[in-house]
Design a protein with these regions (language model features):
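Short, P/G- and charge-enriched loop/turn segments at secondary-structure junctions
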Residues: 5-12, 87-91, 117-120
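Short, well-ordered beta-strand micro-motif
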Residues: 24, 102-104, 131-134
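A short coil-to-beta-strand element that immediately follows conserved catalytic motifs
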Residues: 71-80
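Active-site-adjacent beta-strand/loop module that shapes the phosphate/pyrophosphate-binding cleft
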Residues: 85-115
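A generic structural micro-feature
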Residues: 12-16, 42, 91-97, 122-127
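Acidic, metal-coordinating catalytic segment for phosphate/diphosphate chemistry
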Residues: 1-23, 27
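Nudix hydrolase/Nudix homology domain
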Residues: 40-43, 110-158
């Protein structure tokens, strides 16, 4: 809820956490990433945080190169968060804004996938693996974060 006190606080030091994600869909399946970061096991879509000085597409391309060793080709913008969501993973208050794009990646894929959730050699910070999930089998409970959970219903219509 926006109040005069909150409004004044945000005007003094607005903080936004902007995350950019790609939906890579192939053969009716969508790529997800299982990760262990900041002491949390999480399932989300490939992508990550915007760095100062980056554009949204540059961020997504960097994230795909870092995570998947693949160049993301943007097909289209899919969704940008249009409601308030507080960031829960940072040690300070900020507003989370997620931006999602439909993407393609050249084949053959250079990344490996698994069928088992959290299929890491060991659970250490930065552990990551990728899985394909049939789009028609997506459900909110497969994802960790509120905005990803919300977007799942929309994806079934892609």
């Amino acid at each position: 809820m926006i109040t005069k006190q909150n409004d004044k606080k945000m005007m003094e030091s607005p903080r936004f956490n902007i995350r950019v994600y790609g939906f890579l869909i192939d053969g009716g399946k969508i790529l997800v990433t299982d990760e262990f970061r900041l002491g949390i096991l999480m399932t989300k879509f490939p992508g990550g945080g915007l760095k100062y000085g980056e554009g949204l597409i540059d961020c997504l391309k960097r994230e795909f190169m870092e995570e998947l060793h693949a160049e993301a080709h943007i097909i289209s913008h899919y969704y940008t968060t249009d409601f308030f969501q507080a960031t829960t993973m940072l040690p300070f208050e900020s507003q989370l804004i997620n931006v999602y794009y439909l993407v393609k990646v050249n084949k053959p894929y250079l990344f490996t996938t698994t069928e088992k959730k959290f299929d890491f050699p060991e659970i250490i910070d930065g552990a990551q693996c990728f899985r394909w999930i049939p789009v028609n089998a997506l459900s909110e409970d497969q994802f960790t974060f509120p905005i990803d959970k919300m977007i799942v219903g929309r994806l079934k219509n892609v």
